[in-house]
Amino acid sequence: MRGCPRTGFPWLSAGAGHNRGVDEARRDRDEEGRARNARPRDGLGRPLPYGTPGVERQPEGVVRSPQETVREAQRLLDAGMPFHAHEVFEDAWKSGPDAERELWRGLAQMAVGLTHAARGNSAGGARLLRRGASAVEAFGGRDPHGIGVGPLAAWARELAGRVEAAGREAAGPGGDGGGVDAAAEAPRLRPGPREDGR
């Protein structure tokens, strides 16, 4: 068998190994026929084995008012479900006005950053928290829809620093440590007390 002239590894035939085609007949599909993984998920969005009870997934493509978006995302963040909150922000990002897309995208990135931090991925979590903070800072001073942009950006940067330091301490340079408690670290999207009194 001839190999690659650069690496010497043997050529693999089409369909070998990970390049094998997907059996479209067995692939999970949604009601519209689009590919969608039907495996249950945990509160941080991680796939669970088929048949395992999971957390109900957020419906995709829901158009909400900004107030509904903030209220639903805050509820999910407070429940320790930042992955699901990111999906709510993503709907607003995709359906909202162009002038606000970066705001919703930044909030989605912060929610995914918290998700990664809770899963123990300190490097990815810190990176996304900072990226989201930078995106929302462009809206500083305006606090669109009552969202406390300045305090949110400060929260994200502070958490990114703690997560990064904990990851280095737990696993050495560039490593990942234990995850944070997503509910305990949930940010306040709007200044003021939580609706649940905590």
In which residue ranges do the predicted regions lie?
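N-terminal alpha-helical interaction modules that lie
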Residues: F9-G96, A135-R198
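TPR/TPR-like (Sel1-like) alpha-helical repeat modules
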Residues: S122-G140
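Residue signature of alpha-solenoid helical repeat architecture, marking inter-repeat boundaries
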Residues: V63, R101-L103
